[in-house]
Amino acid sequence: MNIWNWVTSYESDNWRLLRFQWSIFLLTVGARCNQLAVAWWALKETGSASLFSIIIACTIGAEVLSKPLLGWTGDRYSKMKIVLFCNVLTMFSAACLLALSFIDYFSITLVTFAMMLLGIAVGIRDPIQSSIIPQLTLLRSIAIAFNRKAVLSSIAMLLGPAIAGLLVSTWGVTIALIIDFALIAIAISMIVNLNIVGASSTIQTQTTQSIEKPLTTITPPWHTLISSGFKVVFRVKIEFYLALLAMMINLVLFPFFTIIVPFYVQETIQLPAWYIGLLDCSFGVGLLLSSKFLPRLLSFIRFRDRLLMTGFGLLGLNLLAIGLAVPYFILPIFFALGGCGLILINVNTAIVRTLATPACFRNRMVATVSFFSSLASPIGSLIVGLAIAHYGVEITSLLTGVITLTLMLGVALVPNIRVFMRMSEDELDGAYGRFYPSAFR
């Protein structure tokens, strides 16, 4: 079965999940059109990179903060209604930007406000994309569902920038924003009548039932729900340490692509800008192909914890490649391996986190871990920028690779990681509630 048939098949999981994931795909492609259009428009009108950076900083800040502050809404209210609300908010943001572009009026205040609304919508919706999966498919199809999610995300990463660049360069900012608005409208229409069932669990222990019952009978205040997300992550030791590992990955991976790669291509090997695109594309190809084919190739590795360590190893090799001055014609291969490694890390941790967390805490768990991971991006950018200034780009890249390979060894030290990573989907369902009952009270 080819990739297209696989991502559109009805055989392995529910048609509701397929509609939901394809709607997210359209939103992601539309977001790329929006981002490039706004960037091009802002730089053209202001001619100032610093003013444009203010827009980006406010957007990212709104997205990052909305995850822990509003992540509880996905546990308290209907996840599908929350997603629809976020999509409508995204459409309102796109409509504001489109109206401003149509009348040719650029206001940095209004544009920043519209982009912040978009950031809030993305920050709320992103954790739900994972936590809602058990309500849209069967337990036996959870792994397939997360792999398909990764495939569609990878395709969007490859197609989105290309479509956005073509639209902006050929027809201009307004047309790109019209396409974004149209994709959002289609995405909303795909899920507006989509019903979801309760938790997919067929194995409900007394512990899990006692955990979930208070949430339905007693409604805690919003500030308690916010703090409970952090408490759960801190008390479930495996998730606390996995969150630290995720922070360390983002600490080196985000600045690797935003700072190290452009600097290395421009200043060290002195190749044109298209080579940066080639490396990014190679990483995306690794993400795409590994989601479909890598599980079969690595079928001899039976346990998720070993797949997780393999992922850190492949990603570390990618980061080491620049530090070791690998020839430029071989470098894309290492980036493809890095993409494969990132999929192994993300998919296996997401499956365990989503299934093992009791349903009434699932979205807060995902949102809080995502928040910790996002916090590392600006810190890593600052550290890497200073390191390049003092030690050079190759030494800095070498250090990031060594850090990532060290994290591979750190996986083995995470408490109870073998216990949870080696469970079947049926055993994982609500497992954190059984092993850490006090964390969810």
Predicted region positions:
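A single, central transmembrane helix in multi-pass transporters
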Residues: 37, 171-178, 225-291
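Substrate-agnostic recognition of the 12-TM MFS/MFS-like secondary transporter fold
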Residues: 19-35, 59-72, 78-90, 110-168, ...
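Helix-loop junctions on the cytosolic side of multi-pass membrane transporters
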Residues: 104, 135, 177, 181-211, ...
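Small-residue hotspots at the loop-to-helix junctions and early N-terminal turns
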Residues: 34, 41, 46-54, 147, ...
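Structural signal for membrane-spanning alpha-helices in multi-pass inner-membrane proteins
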Residues: 39, 94-101, 164, 168, ...
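C-terminal transmembrane bundle of multi-pass solute transporters/carriers
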Residues: 65-69, 76, 80-82, 86-87, ...
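Juxtamembrane intracellular "pre-TM" segments in multi-pass secondary transporters
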Residues: 2-18, 197-244, 430-440
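Transmembrane alpha-helix termini and helix-breaking/packing motifs in multi-pass membrane transporters
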Residues: 40-44, 98, 102-103, 159-179, ...
